[in-house]
């Protein structure tokens, strides 16, 4: 097997629904692609259910078709922009931990085959702390935890970080505050989370910024597009471009953790 081109693998997650995680995944992916990065967004939530609403796309095939040998991973990719594609993972993710050795090998080959066509893999996980979420997050190189200004958001984010740290030794997390009314509000949310993690866990948290509450985001969703395209000069669009700039500066780790082949191996391993 050829050595895989190093790919930055980022899992976007949050301890609960309603934090705008899918919107973050999609807009971050679009912003990175606008910078010239080749991005694959893996929808690991409910197939294209959420991403479909945001991008107006329809998937003919899913990862399950690749596992059954009906098509290649490249044939499953749905192009969303010039340098952005989506992997509709829908039904395939349900059986990720029950793959045969042959399917396991096929999946690694499949991702290895498309490694050369991408620089970044963004994984939009489901809400909560299900086995599927844990699998995707612990396999990724970077974990971006999205929080918003609701009391349960911080509590649920802490529960997710605690589980990943205690059971899977994930010890480094990036935190993004979404739908904030000021950057200070975002920093305050991060401080609350940092206070409890510093007290009870051995983890490193890094604040990566905030996305402002912006009516343009809701209007873009109604138009089945992203705020970066519908309202490119909006406050939210500007914030997403700043976030993409920061993410682009994150190093691709030299260790195998986060490389595609390793990502898939971790994904299909029984915990």
Locate predicted features.
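Conserved nucleotide-binding/hydrolysis micro-motifs of P-loop NTPases
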Residues: 46-48, 91-94, 128, 150-152, ...
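G-domain G4 guanine-recognition motif of GTPases
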Residues: 15, 148, 173-187, 210-217, ...
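Conserved C-terminal guanine-recognition region of P-loop GTPase G domains, centered on the G4
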Residues: 154-169
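Walker A/P-loop NTP-binding active-site region of P-loop NTPases
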Residues: 9-73, 120-123
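P-loop/Walker-type NTP enzyme "switch/lid" segment
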Residues: 42-116, 221-226
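NTP-binding/hydrolysis catalytic cores, primarily Walker-type P-loop NTPases
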Residues: 227-271
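Beta-strand-loop-alpha "switch" segments that mediate conformational coupling across diverse proteins
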Residues: 201-228, 239-242
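Inter-motif core of Ras-like GTPase G domains
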Residues: 113-116, 130-152
């Amino acid at each position: 097997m050829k050595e895989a081109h190093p790919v930055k693998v980022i899992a976007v997650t949050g301890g609960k629904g309603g934090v705008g995680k899918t919107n973050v995944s999609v807009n971050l992916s679009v912003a990175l692609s606008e910078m010239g990065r080749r991005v694959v967004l893996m929808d690991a939530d409910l197939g294209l259910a959420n991403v479909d609403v945001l991008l107006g796309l329809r998937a003919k095939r899913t990862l399950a078709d690749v596992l059954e040998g009906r098509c290649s991973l490249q044939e499953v990719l749905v192009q969303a922009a010039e340098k952005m594609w989506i992997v509709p993972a829908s039904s395939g993710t349900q059986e990720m931990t029950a793959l045969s050795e042959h399917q396991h090998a096929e999946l690694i080959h499949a991702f290895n085959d498309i490694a050369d066509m991408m620089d970044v893999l963004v994984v939009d996980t489901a809400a909560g702390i299900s086995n599927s979420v844990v699998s995707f997050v612990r396999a990724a190189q970077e974990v971006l935890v999205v929080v918003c200004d609701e009391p349960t958001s911080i509590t649920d984010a802490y529960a997710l970080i605690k589980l990943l740290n205690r059971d899977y030794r994930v010890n480094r997390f990036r935190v993004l505050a979404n739908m904030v009314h000021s950057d200070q509000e975002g920093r305050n949310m991060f401080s609350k989370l940092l206070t409890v993690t510093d007290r009870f866990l051995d983890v490193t948290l890094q604040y990566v910024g905030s996305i402002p509450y912006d009516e343009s985001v809701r209007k873009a969703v109604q138009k089945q597009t992203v705020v970066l395209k519908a309202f490119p000069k909006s406050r939210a669009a500007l914030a997403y471009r700043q976030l993409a700039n920061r993410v682009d500066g994150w190093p691709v780790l030299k260790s195998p953790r986060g490389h595609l082949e390793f990502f898939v191996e971790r994904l299909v391993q029984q915990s």
